[in-house]
Amino acid sequence: MRLTLLGTGDARQVPVYGCQCVACLAARADQALRRLPCSALIECADQRWLIDSGLTDLTERFPPHSLSGILQTHYHADHAQGLLHLRWGQGLVIPVHGPADPEGLADLYKHPGILDFSQPFAAFETRALGALQVTALPLMHSRLTSVICWRVKGSASLT
């Protein structure tokens, strides 16, 4: 099992627009110091799951059929804006496991395109996704959202 952090920034990201602090100045000078919107990739056996889809370049990063699906914690823009581009793909279906949130981000549920929101997580529900065990834990974050707890062979982590 391998976890790759693709984006660790909050809604502001780093560098923060207009900020002149040392960290933001350094991030402007060195791309490696930038913090992109939330997203991670978990690879387990022959499966690849995206945890949150905050990156806007998902269609360039992940060729068609390269993801097993998406584990979405909630639908704030900084965690889900990549879905807005991804949904317009063709020739495949990508399962999105996350909380039921038809009011979530813009009109994603109304116009899902290739995204399949048909299996939302319930609080404390555990699912087996191949060798990966995933549990949705409720969390209040301006509205009720989910924290994803993932386990592989006895090891666990919260995202």
Residue ranges and their predicted role:
Residues M1-L158:
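Binuclear metal-dependent hydrolase catalytic cores
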